[in-house]
Amino acid sequence: MNASTSTGTAVPTTPRLTSLSHGGGCGCKIAPGVLSELLAKSNLPKQFFPDLLVGTETADDAAVYKINDEQAIVATTDFFMPIVDDPYDFGRIAATNALSDIYAMGGTPLMALAIVGMPINMLPHDVIAKILEGGESVCRDAGIPLAGGHSIDSVEPIYGLVGIGIVNPKQMKRNADAKAGDVLILGKPLGVGILSAALKKNLLDEAGYAAMISATTQLNRPGADLSKLDGVHALTDVTGFGLLGHALELARGAQLSAHIDSAHLPVLPDVQSLAEQGIFTGASGRNWASYGEHIQIDSSVSDARKALLTDPQTSGGLLVSCAADAAEQVLKVFADSGFGEAAVIGHMESGEAKVFVR
């Protein structure tokens, strides 16, 4: 890609990172319905390893392998294409998102490996270096080494991490153990996908961008502390399938109904007005097409609010299912860690494994 000077000399220009990918962030995920179909057709054999505590049988955030009665390894991988144009911010967001899966299991990160795919002949090497630096800065913030990785020359920019963590098997939290009567608490405000769509359309101002970066680069550290609370029954993080998709996973895992109060959702600045203007990602529609038949939304809920409920979150917040009498303690753990917008957004009830929204 070139631009011309006043003398007519061709000068190479750096393309916007988001212009090099067909999607960005966790909105790149294969739609949940399509993924289920692919896995069903793959005929993967069931695995019987007594020390594999969490594998492919459930929709959990990471694999967990028991080492002894007090320690288990948590392993996950996550990567995607750019959600922003700033390379350093892209690296930070991707790394924060990858480590979130460890926190969502109640674990503590130990180390990470980088996954790097870059169009080497299209991106200046100093841009790629900034992506790597952004990822390393998050690992440093998490107190872990970025110990290596693997790279390829790819058509679209891809960056992420393999994350390795540790958890006490007795304190590990899954997304399938919610109980009837639990309240649902969301740790971060929603709207990252809508803000990223606005960014691509040049409709996002500096304040909106700053809010998006702040949310997506905030490590979900409270997960490790929440896992130690007896009243916390289930834990996951809200990412590419949107709040409804991950709430549905909680409902299916526990064979309960999840009930969401849309009026109580924490929302990033400007997101509601952008949604009312029809700004949202293609992944939002794909999410609804995949699981909409299992969602019941009250007629009073606006279309803009519905878009927010299916909005793919990149490096989204923890979704906690806890006993009602533990809610205050859970909110305090969030607040003490800088998650001041954490809020009670619903509850779990006995009933059909669906999500009900009012």
Predicted stretch roles:
Residues 2-358:
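Helix-biased detector of long, well-ordered alpha-helical tracts
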